[in-house]
Amino acid sequence: VSAAGLRSLNGESGCLDCHSVRRLAIMTSDARGLALERFRWVGGHADVWQIFRDPGALAAVVGDLAGPFRDDGVTAVCGIESRGFLLGAAVAVELGVGFVAVRKGEGIFPGEKLTRRSDPDYRGTRQELRLQRAAVGPRDRVLLVDDWIETGSQAWAVRSMVEQCGGHWAGCTVIVDQTTPARRADLGVRSIVTAAELPAWDGQS
């Protein structure tokens, strides 16, 4: 995520001014303050890695990402390469369920797979996403975990593959929410903070 992309999405959708709608999806705990404290802009790009470096912040964030879905019957957590692997696996352990990987591009991924090409993201890029067909079944209720959601195009592609496998969509839980109210409702997005709450890029760091 870049500072330019953040400004572009804010200007196009206006969704980040819809405080009353946005607040309904926000979780409150120590994780929110820790995420805001450790977030940085580096070269105009969002850097959430410092959150992961701090064990207390990481534990708080993982707990908050899992929190709204503890009693939701989730049977598997899904994560998109690459930060989704880190966060998704941690949330899966927190919930006591297994992890399902979604890979990008042409990396080695054995077995029969489903493939989706996402709609363009905030940079205009379309990602090819792949899911092992055997990883999700009709009895599964799948939660997607990621660090940031902007257009929701990749999350929507993952939902399509999960449902093609016969699985059920539990929702999407992220650290930073930058999507529109309509897409937020469609995907069942829960977040720790919104993009509007992040410190502004100073144009130098």
Describe the residue ranges of each PLM region.
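Short, glycine/charge-rich flexible loops or terminal/linker lids adjacent to PRPP-binding catalytic cores
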Residues: 97-142
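Short, ordered loop/turn segments at secondary-structure junctions
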Residues: 82, 104-107, 175-178
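Short glycine-rich phosphate-binding loop at a beta-alpha junction
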Residues: 74-81
